[in-house]
């Protein structure tokens, strides 16, 4: 909880389903997503828990309709997560963000968003490695999660696709092909054991079914 792993989205999806069930109704995924977006303000977190795989979604400009598309996540792309022994307050995470961003940074992130979708759709590791870079929030939030910069250095010689914040943090996500996972995980264990407060390490696969 409170470390960027989507617990709020999962809780909302479960609560909406339960509210329908207790009234003798069976909600569709569209029902849950629509109500969940009204509660959270945006659909991404609820959609991820609800639908599984990789979800690209947004709100229609004309009404409250949610437009979403599901992409098959490559089976061999595994997710390692480092969870530090602290949580981040939402207000603190937001305070470090600038009120305005450079035009070129916004454009760079828009380009990379499209290219990340292409990398998943094409199962292209080289492309993912090249584009899994953020210029809108990580440069500011890494001061709150110093482990991010440290792990990027620790893993710089390993064939990972990326090392990024999970949500706003404090959890850190490492994307790696299954064939390299064990060696990367071993390096993470060595690093974790050297820390004053040993972080948790999660060895995960992407859920493909959702709720």
Where on the chain are the PLM-derived regions?
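A short, flexible beta-alpha/helix-coil linker loop
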Residues: 1, 134-137, 170
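Short, flexible active-site loop motifs that bind/organize anionic cofactors or intermediates
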Residues: 2, 22, 83, 171
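Short acidic/histidine-rich active-site segments
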Residues: 165-168
